Amino acid sequence: MNPVAMTSDLTGNARQLCARFAKASLGRALWQLTNTLPAFALLWLLMAWSVLSGWGYGWTLLLALPTAGLYVRLFIIQHDCGHGSYFASRRANQWVGCCLGLITLFPFGYWKKTHAVHHGTSGNLDRREFGDVRTLTVKEYRARSRLGRFFYRCYRSMPVLLGLGPIFQFVIKHRIPFNLPLSWRREWHSVLLNNLTLLLAVVACSLALGWHVVLLVQLPMLLIAGALGVWLFYVQHTFEHAYWLRQKDWDSNQAAVDGSSYYDLPRVLHWLTGNIGYHHIHHLAPRIPNYRLRAAFESSPLLRRAPRLTLRTSLECVRMKLWDEDRGRMVGFPG
């Protein structure tokens, strides 16, 4: 099918998709929280116990893997609360989103606002602001100084994106959001409240368990979860035939469908990642809660023709570094 025709059809069906699947289910939302939050808490306590009892730190690191997976699932629930899709009640979305922000370390109000900007500007070369992995065009890269190109190469390397990136997000960007306009008072209040509550929680846990236990538990879990989260976001928008256009030609519906991938994961990984692999559907209709994304995907043959990635083919995204405006595709660094 012609990509333009496919996008045209999808645009026409977007309202129907929203109306049919953009409905919160209290039962499914509560069940999702019930099978995620207690399991996360139990694994976190087991990690702490493994440190306190002297089992050997290898057991702690092993437990960090499933704990990090459940962290990602909790983050997706918070993400849905930010879109107002998880519960029908706005107040419930607000309260649950704020509470989960104490676990994910993402201030709910701040993240909600910047993520909305991402949805409104994804794939727009003239609006590369919040919530994107910074992407230069080939011409922009070549116009930079040698030092500028070096720094961009470092930034786009996997050790930096998946290693230093999560540390930057957790420790700096969401603690002191230097890029946040001062006029966004509600979002600043969200950051300050989240920081204060986290400080009190860390002090309380440190007094109860010891600061070294908190550090030895939180650090590996957050690094693994952060790397998983960054990778998911990376492959959702960074693939060869992605979508980037200037403002005058940019279309939000086309950006949603052509600029977001369908990450075809094993069922257990879809469960852990809250079905965010159906990312093209999420961008087309953000009010669909994660527990209905798969049903939306299976309802339309057109939606199953979205840019598809598997675990194996997603590795090819690693070499995608620049957007070539002339060729209309992502490319690697020039030789």
Where are these regions (language model features)?
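Active-site-flanking alpha-helical
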Residues: L43, G82, Y86-F87, W244, ...
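Histidine-centered catalytic micro-motifs
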Residues: L74-H83, W111-G123, L232-H241, L272-I288
